[in-house]
Amino acid sequence: MSIFIGGAWPYANGSLHLGHIASLLPGDILARYYRAKGENVLYVSGSDCNGTPIAIRAKQEGVTAKEIANKYHEEFERCFRNLGFTYDCYTRTDSEHHHETVQNVFLRLLEEGHIYKKTVEQAYCETCTQFLPDCYVEGVCPHCHEEARGDQCDACSAILDPLDLLEKKCKLCGSTPSIQETEHFYFALHTFQEQIKRAVEIAKQTGTWRDNAIQLTERYVKEGLLDRAVSRDLPIGVPIPVEGYEDKKIYVWIEAVTGYYSASKHWAEETGKDDREFWDGEAKTYYVHGKDNIPFHSVIWPAVLLGIGEGTIPRHIVSNEYLTVEKRKLSTSKNWAVWVPDILERYDPDSIRYFLIVNAPENRDTDFSWREFIYSHNSELLGAYGNFVNRTLKFIEKYYGGIMPKGSIDVELKDKIERLYKHVGEAIEQTKFKVALESIFDAVRFANKYFDERQPWKEREDDPVSCEETIYNCVYLIANFANLLEPFLPFSSERIRNTLSIVNRNWEPQHTLPSRIDSVQPLFERIDVKQIECELEKLYGAVK
């Protein structure tokens, strides 16, 4: 089976925060799992280097947009790598390859009659002497009356036109823009109304889209899909490939999602492999992002794919809700965030991954708390998982000189592990990652209870053969926990694999155990709870 996984493209205008990772982490879990199953996986993403936010940041810092994009693209690559993300292709939207692919898609839509020209009114700043891109216009949402940008309201998820905003102002200088006429290209989105409606109905029947994606898209369909501009007067981006319009750029909402397509083509060129199997309608596709990106993946991207004649549209939409920080809405402008480069300097990446999975905003907003983060590490990763691994392997090191005791796999334990693989695999495929991880840790707690009830420290003297059986089965459990947890906690799983000399990485029970165990090291270190206050002081002290 071919599996295509697309992770949303973060804007290269500032560091990643935990909200980004909470929404993107499911993609890596899926990729690792399906590779272990032996499926043909293509997992792609990249940095959005063309968006208006990059131009704004560059202007604020007095540097070029390219310098800003380069800085954060490199930082993103480093952060994703250090967190264990296994993208097959992580690229950027200002690459020549991406520009060519997007322009080809634009021309194909134009040829098929899905794009047309239209004279429209647009916000114009007399002070800045320029037409304002949608993100350059700020004001009040006409629907929920919260602060909003000209393209979308984050509060109610409404897709907006800048002219819809109340109390409009230029983001650059704060003045009230005038309204002037200009010509733009439009995408005939309304022509895909029935196909999008059918896609939502199928997703509802199969449960392959998150509830928030279904509800929001149903709302858009009920209101009637409106044609959207596909060109804008932007300072950076992909030029319109039509003579006389080269000074205009392809609007980022259609250009950025086409990044999945361009990344796929780039991967094919780089590897010499064929990517057609990921776009022929037979592939299982997953699109992973936050709920603010729902309309771009449930409406815009399917319409683009249908418009260019591709056989597949998003089958699974994994759209997480928001992550708050210490019960407050995350705000990059106010510096109320936990920044990824910062937290990676001091904490194990598996600790970060674990917390963001068991507290994932899968169906509702969830909160990142420094207290809960540190206590979950100490009680679950160290106290439950690390404790079971460490006391089992240390027992072998101390009483058997590192030689693996002889034994046979307990039939009941074998059955339990086989059922666990099936249950966890099904949960992952259904994008219920929290359920999957919690199921494994239920088994870890069972393993600790098994160790305590068998009392190998007493069996060693009273019944040495039973003691060997106990420890043998504990190692069997450890080997399989490492395999089951690899999609979630890859770094600690790798440490266990190295200790146990496990080569097989397939998604199946591990029955081959090592003959010898050397150099046993703690799987996790305890985090001093005093760090809670230190982190809170740092967080509150950095607020703008």
UniProtKB/Swiss-Prot annotation:
Q: Drop me one GO molecular function for this one.
A: methionine-tRNA ligase activity
Q: Where does the secretion signal sit in this chain?
A: none
Q: Which UniProt keywords apply?
A: Aminoacyl-tRNA synthetase, ATP-binding, Cytoplasm, Ligase, Metal-binding, Nucleotide-binding, Protein biosynthesis, Zinc
Reactions that this protein is recorded to catalyse? tRNA(Met) + L-methionine + ATP = L-methionyl-tRNA(Met) + AMP + diphosphate
Supply the InterPro entries for this chain. aa-tRNA-synth_I_CS, Anticodon_Met, Met-tRNA_ligase_1, Met-tRNA_synth, Methionyl/Leucyl_tRNA_Synth, MetRS_core, MetRS_Zn, Rossmann-like_a/b/a_fold
User: Where on this chain is 'KMSKS' region (motif)?
Assistant: 329-333
Major site of localization recorded for this protein: cytoplasm
Q: Which residues bind ATP?
A: T332
Q: How is the cofactor bound?
A: Binds 1 zinc ion per subunit.
Q: Which cofactor does it need?
A: Zn(2+)
State the superkingdom: Bacteria
* Motif range ('HIGH' region): 10-20
Enzyme class comes to ligase
Quaternary structure and partners: Monomer.
Its biological purpose is as follows:
Is required not only for elongation of protein synthesis but also for the initiation of all mRNA translation through initiator tRNA(fMet) aminoacylation.
This chain's protein is named Methionine--tRNA ligase 2
Specify the species.
Bacillus anthracis
